[in-house]
Amino acid sequence: MPVTLAGQLVVAISSRALFDFEEENRLFEATDDRAYMRLQLERVDEPAKPGVAFSLVNKLLAFNAGEAPHVEVVILSRNDPVSGMRVFRSAKHYGLPIQRGVFTRGESPWRYLRPLSANLFLSTNEADVRSALAADVPAARVYPHSARASSAHPNEVRIAFDGDAVLFSDEAERVYQRAGLDAFQAHERERAAKPLAPGPFKPLLEALQRLQMEPSPEMRIRTALVTARSAPAHERAIRTLMDWHIEIDEAMFLGGLAKGEFLREFEPDFFFDDQTGHIENAAAHVPAGHVASGVSNP
């Protein structure tokens, strides 16, 4: 029987999202891939520093402490295979049990998400992220200069999500951008009992809820909805989650307030939002990734 990842939460991640390869990337952009490969080979025994998504990956892999594996992390990288050696060695140095990887030397690796049945793709490459989202894979462009995750919650995976165009469709956001706040509030008040259509990250939230149900005395998941919505538009968001039989732990209806300082207090391992302004504000405080979906991302 072939090995299968069925039933596991599968996270595909680029090497630059997992580890801090910013210095090496600057050399690549200034020269070529061969100079980059030489530098990575020279540093093959030097563990790379943790990157923006390191804490998220490290904590998710902790769900595998029991006999049955629940989480699989796969490197999906534009790096060359030689540079891939340093990625695997860095993972081993930090005790990350990562065994699988695909290295494509400059080619887009997103097409390998399908045979992996990936639940999430994290990359610093916007084109790859957009391709993944077009293929219905939850994906985000990691901001490599984001603040690193807090170490205050070692036994919790903390993930924060925007609502419209991330967990939910962009239906309401389109009304807001076309007709303004008053029309948006009226639209949502009139449809409070009608669930919103799913957004690109609903499948990930469902997968996280399934993972939370697995017996794990060491780890738990804590989720937050962090949205620019405010009352009365809050009700449709809550009722939509109820209709999906999904529970979240915290909800912040901020009515247009900047999200960054609220996220700083929540201390997530990662935050997902569809608007670059929100991500840039958040990235000063927490690890953040841009979801290039919906009307704000033509």
Model-inferred region functions:
Residues 100-105, 123, 140-141, 251-255, ...:
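Short acidic-hydrophobic, aromatic-tinged amphipathic segments that line or gate anion-handling sites
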Residues 94-97, 116-117, 135-136, 244-247, ...:
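Short, structured coil segments at secondary-structure junctions
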Residues 76-78, 122-125, 226-229, 272-275:
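Short His-Asn-centered micro-motif
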Residues 110-111, 260:
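Short hydrophobic/charged patches on amphipathic alpha-helices used for structural packing
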Residues 2-107, 153, 162-253:
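Alpha-helical substrate-recognition element adjacent to the catalytic core
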Residues 1-11, 126-159, 163-190, 202, ...:
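Asp-based, Mg2+/Mn2+-dependent phosphohydrolase catalytic module
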Residues 99, 119, 157, 249, ...:
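Conserved acidic residues
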